[in-house]
């Protein structure tokens, strides 16, 4: 198996062609440079390349890139040889909205591309490296993409003029006919110029959106591997409430499937989402060991309670759809909670991301400290037995329901245990006005209300809320 490379360029650069030949690692590679100063659209040039190329595998790439990976051609050929993909690139996305702006939702973008411009070099990274795997996509960027001529269904759409949307047009028309499209991460490319969204780009976008209005949006879901269950290990139920945060759900789910402890069931509660993307995401989920429940909006406490009602796990771990766990978190929680039946919850230190950044060391658990104020992360493990003993989360509370939950667990004789490691990542969205953000603005009032509810304040008039400490994270000192 050999490789053909098609390039559209204003002036044929023999040095660039030599670099292609030497760096590819492919014997008798075929280079097809087409000199083009605007006489032809890119779709016309690329169709010429499809016709003129003698090899089954054809690479289309810009003439302003550097190949940072040795034997990149051999790697590309190997991807096609070991898979049934028809189109493969180094950057792309799983979601194409009706606007045709494929970068609208960064969590759905994939790949890594270096950029070099005006003496500066930087890496645009949309997800971490994933070895020699191929991640399914709905389209790939035209910077660098290979095709198998025997697997594609359509050539380039010559009704698209100029140099924009040739890649989207080619990918989408093939994707809609069942051609598999994917992104790889083991070939590094440096782009030596910046993309432009000029008037031609905008007109092509409008035309593209109109043409495919009945097909957009498009979404390709992540394929997760089966969890590997071990005998004589307790089952842990991961409860994930979702309300209009589908854009981060894949990241949260990836952190679940990356766990070293695999005896897991996943329960996703769609709490009445109204966001079109979230509904599309949930409609397209196909995940092993997972139950998806749709319900009217009832709030976080109701969603967690409904999840626990149908779970089979001996232990429960709530996870918000915009947060993630580090790979050993569940395993370390299970190892801790198995030491003593009275342990609930198990919690850890926290990595903060978003509008607040840093690592927060959580206090050690004690009754006195817990009464002072909340410090246990909402993504903490507890036993189903402990949950049942207190009747679950209080659905009447609008904020700090987890704090009330831990207090009632304490009053039933359960004790908390801290894992002194940052194994949980909490993302802040203060500007978006989430329930937790609004609750924290009224923390003194909520604190007092919850203590009164649980009969933990003896002298109400003497109650004084504690001030924030200097960490910027712990609410109470």
Please place each PLM-identified region on the residue numbering.
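Extreme N-terminal starter segment of soluble prokaryotic enzymes
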Residues: 1-4, 234-236
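Acidic donor-binding segment of Leloir-type glycosyltransferases
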Residues: 6-44, 48-52, 253-294
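Conserved donor NDP-sugar-binding/catalytic core segment of glycosyltransferases
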Residues: 39, 66, 70-113, 328-359
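A short, conserved alpha-helix in the catalytic core of glycosyltransferases
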Residues: 76, 138-147, 151, 160-187, ...
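A recurrent flexible, glycine/aromatic-enriched loop bordering the glycosyltransferase active site
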Residues: 120-146, 363-381
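Catalytic core of nucleotide-sugar-dependent glycosyltransferases
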Residues: 198-224, 421-422, 426-429, 435-463
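Nucleotide-sugar donor-binding/catalytic module of glycosyltransferases
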Residues: 231-442, 469-470
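Membrane-proximal basic amphipathic "stem/tether" segments
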Residues: 323, 452-477
């Amino acid at each position: 198996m050999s490789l053909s490379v098609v390039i559209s360029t204003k002036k044929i650069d023999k040095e660039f062609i030599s670099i292609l030949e030497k760096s590819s690692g492919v014997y008798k590679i075929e280079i097809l440079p087409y000199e083009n100063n605007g006489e032809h659209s890119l779709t016309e040039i690329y169709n010429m390349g499809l016709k003129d190329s003698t090899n089954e595998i054809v690479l289309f790439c810009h003439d302003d890139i550097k190949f940072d990976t040795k034997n990149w051609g051999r790697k590309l050929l190997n991807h096609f040889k070991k898979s049934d993909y028809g189109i493969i690139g180094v950057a792309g996305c799983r979601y194409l909205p009706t606007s045709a702006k494929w970068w609208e939702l960064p969590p759905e973008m994939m790949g890594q591309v270096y950029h070099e411009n005006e003496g500066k070099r930087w890496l645009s990274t949309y997800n971490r490296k994933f070895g020699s795997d191929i991640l399914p996509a709905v389209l790939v960027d035209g910077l660098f993409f290979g095709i198998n001529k025997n697997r594609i269904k359509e050539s380039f759409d010559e009704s698209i003029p100029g140099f924009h949307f040739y890649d989207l047009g080619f990918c989408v028309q093939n994707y809609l006919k069942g051609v598999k499209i994917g992104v790889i991460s083991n070939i590094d490319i440096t782009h030596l110029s910046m993309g432009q969204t000029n008037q031609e780009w905008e007109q092509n976008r409008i035309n593209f959106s109109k043409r495919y209005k009945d097909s957009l949006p498009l979404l390709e879901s992540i394929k997760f591997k089966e969890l590997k269950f071990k005998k004589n290990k307790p089952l842990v139920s991961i409860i994930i409430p979702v309300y209009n945060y589908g854009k981060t759900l894949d990241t949260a789910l990836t952190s679940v499937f990356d766990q070293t402890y695999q005896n897991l069931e996943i329960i996703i509660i769609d709490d009445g989402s109204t966001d079109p993307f979230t509904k599309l995401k949930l409609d397209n989920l196909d995940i092993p060991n997972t139950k998806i429940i749709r319900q009217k909006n009832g709030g976080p406490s109701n969603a967690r309670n409904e999840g626990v009602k149908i779970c089979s796990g001996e232990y429960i771990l709530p996870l918000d759809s915009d947060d993630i766990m580090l790979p050993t978190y569940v395993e370390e929680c299970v190892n801790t909670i198995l030491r003593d039946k009275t342990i609930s919850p198990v919690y850890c230190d926290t990595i903060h991301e978003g509008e607040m950044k840093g690592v927060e060391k959580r206090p050690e658990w004690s009754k006195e400290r817990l009464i002072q104020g909340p410090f246990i992360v909402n993504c903490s493990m507890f036993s189903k037995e402990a949950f049942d003993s207190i009747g679950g989360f209080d659905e009447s509370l609008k904020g700090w329901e987890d704090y009330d939950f831990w207090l009632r667990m304490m009053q039933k004789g359960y004790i908390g245990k801290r894992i002194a490691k940052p194994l949980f990542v909490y993302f802040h969205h203060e500007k978006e006005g989430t329930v937790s953000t609004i609750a924290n603005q009224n923390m003194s009032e909520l604190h007092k209300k919850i203590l009164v509810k649980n009969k933990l304040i003896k002298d109400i008039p003497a109650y004084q809320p504690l001030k924030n400490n200097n960490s910027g994270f712990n609410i109470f000192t």
